[in-house]
Amino acid sequence: MKLVAVDVGNTSTAVGLWSDGRVSRVSHCDGGFDEAKKAALALARSSGASCVAYVSVVPKADRAWRAFAKARGLAFRQVTYRCFADKKGGKIPLSSSNSKLQLELGHGRGLSIDYPKPETIGADRLADAVGAVSRHGAPLIVMDFGTALTAAVVTRDCVWRGGVIAPGFPLMRDYLFERTAKLPQMKLGSGRAPKIGRSTEEAMRFGALVGYRGMVREIVAELRRNFGEDFRLVATGGFAKWVLRDLDLPFVVDPTLTLYGAGLICSREF
């Protein structure tokens, strides 16, 4: 099965071809809907894909993408908690609080959700967790380094237990510039922190890099203490490689994880 996988984030949109469990021909579009639409249309035409696998954290974009798919005769499947079935295999009731949901992935794998209000879980977090369990196995912590930093915890029994949401690195970087009178816009640079700041920009870079990596390290340590599990560590998102460089934790960086998870979910019949 071939799908055009679309991941709409707060600052950019990723578009890629999902075909029989593999993601290829990925475009990262920073120019808004028109640029991403062109990339998706080109993929659909050249690959013969029949469906859009859609994951979004921007609700106002949903209608435009649904209309795009309809206008071109493509099926439209959107990642939500309703892609999961209840424990009896039936449809999820409208009042879903405290329900236990699951998605079978084949080959004896699956992901269950044990969460008070599953309808509040971000679609990207669901796609990340499903993709990570399929590719890397449980138990794991999967972190998505985007505009926000999100983390999902999947325990050894393949159950999504909850997660963490924190400001993403670009929010930290931009807020210093926007909310102070004299601090400059910080450049990302190589991702290596200086030994100490010997200029304003170096001081900002040291604080941002060392401080942010310290936050990531402490989140992982606290989750390991709370659950008593030696979690695998999986990372995705546009800032993952940059933030994790030189961090003394064994993260596997998986750049196409969200697209892969979206395709995997939407390739199921639901």
Please report, for each region that a protein language model flagged, where it lies by residue:
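Glycine-rich phosphate-binding loops at beta-strand->alpha-helix junctions
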Residues: 12, 55-64, 206-209, 229-246
